[in-house]
């Protein structure tokens, strides 16, 4: 994949950097692997907003992805690499020798015609899936299961990869993209290689309208609201917060307050916590 930068012919193209989609080999998805998807728009089953700044956006059809890789010991071949509007990673259409078709996440380095297979004793090649206990130390993996047979739950984003760093009894230690080291049961499946389309981190939407196409609505700072709408609101002009620190719209302390539950069941499986980011991310905005 490559990226394409635009000249500033208009304000919307001044900062625009997008994928060139050179790796896409098919424009129409496989109809048998499509299902309709209802957009929740940030609402729960009662219609109450549980996630702000969501709504609108282009209609999408969900592509059924094979995260389980449970078609064991049946060779398959990648026949196309496609765009998926529901994720940053590309997806690959696989034809298996028994005639079945499935979508998988496209690993970095594969192309049309690459053979893949899933099983306990498969070759250590990009795109193949196998239990963690059979993967050599130092190998890069993605689409990792946390519960055997449930399907991959972590390391699925574009460009993401984990590394097998140790094997201890019934567990395998993985170094995750966040630098956290976590123990996973040895019988859990993982796919060899990293997820493709890593250059997506270098892209830029360029204008607010493209954000709306993705279903993201504007985020209004609390300091420009009225006191009835946000604890930061009110005052004359650009007034300070008036508190010891920033808070959420519901008065809970923000920016630095730990949100992970104490005595969580998975605490015993985490050997090393992820390091704190030196840069302030989305949470650094005036909530």
UniProtKB/Swiss-Prot annotation:
A cellular component term, taken from the record's GO annotations: large ribosomal subunit
GO molecular function: rRNA binding; structural constituent of ribosome; transferase activity
InterPro entries linked to this entry: NA-bd_OB-fold, Rib_uL2_dom2, Ribosomal_uL2, Ribosomal_uL2_bac/org-type, Ribosomal_uL2_C, Ribosomal_uL2_CS, Ribosomal_uL2_dom3, Ribosomal_uL2_RNA-bd_dom
The entry's keywords: Ribonucleoprotein, Ribosomal protein, RNA-binding, rRNA-binding
Any one Gene Ontology BP term: translation
Biased composition (Basic residues): 271-287
Pfam families linked: Ribosomal_L2, Ribosomal_L2_C
Region (Disordered): 216-287
Known function: One of the primary rRNA binding proteins. Required for association of the 30S and 50S subunits to form the 70S ribosome, for tRNA binding and peptide bond formation. It has been suggested to have peptidyltransferase activity; this is somewhat controversial. Makes several contacts with the 16S rRNA in the 70S ribosome.
Record-stated family: Belongs to the universal ribosomal protein uL2 family.
NCBIfam families registered for this protein in UniProt: rplB_bact
Subunit structure and binding partners: Part of the 50S ribosomal subunit. Forms a bridge to the 30S subunit in the 70S ribosome.
Protein name (database record): Large ribosomal subunit protein uL2
């Amino acid at each position: 994949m490559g990226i394409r930068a635009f000249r500033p012919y208009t304000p919307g193209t001044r900062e625009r950097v997008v994928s060139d989609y050179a790796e896409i080999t098919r424009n129409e998805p496989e109809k048998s692997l499509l299902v309709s998807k209802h957009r929740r728009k940030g609402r729960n089953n009662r219609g109450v907003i549980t996630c702000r700044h969501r709504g609108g956006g282009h209609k999408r059809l969900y592509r059924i992805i094979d995260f389980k890789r449970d078609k064991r010991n049946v060779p398959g071949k990648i026949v196309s690499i496609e765009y998926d509007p529901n994720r940053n990673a590309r997806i690959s259409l696989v034809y298996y020798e028994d005639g079945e078709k499935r979508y998988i996440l496209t690993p970095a380095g594969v192309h049309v015609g690459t053979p893949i297979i899933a099983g306990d004793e498969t070759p250590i090649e990009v795109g193949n899936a196998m239990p963690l206990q059979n993967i050599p130390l130092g190998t890069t993996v993605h689409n990792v299961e946390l519960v055997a047979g449930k399907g991959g739950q972590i390391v699925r984003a574009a460009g993401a990869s984990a590394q097998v760093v140790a094997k201890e009894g019934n567990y395998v230690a993985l170094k995750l993209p966040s630098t956290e080291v976590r123990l996973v049961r040895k019988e859990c499946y993982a796919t060899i290689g990293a997820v493709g389309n890593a250059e997506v981190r270098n892209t830029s939407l360029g204008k607010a309208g493209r954000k709306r196409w993705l279903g993201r609505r504007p985020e209004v700072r609390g300091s420009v609201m009225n006191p009835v709408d946000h604890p930061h609101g009110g005052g004359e002009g650009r007034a300070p917060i008036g508190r010891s620190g920033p808070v959420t719209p519901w008065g809970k302390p923000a920016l630095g307050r730990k949100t992970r539950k104490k005595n969580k069941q998975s605490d015993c499986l985490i050997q090393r916590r992820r390091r704190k980011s030196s840069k302030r991310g989305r949470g650094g905005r005036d909530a």
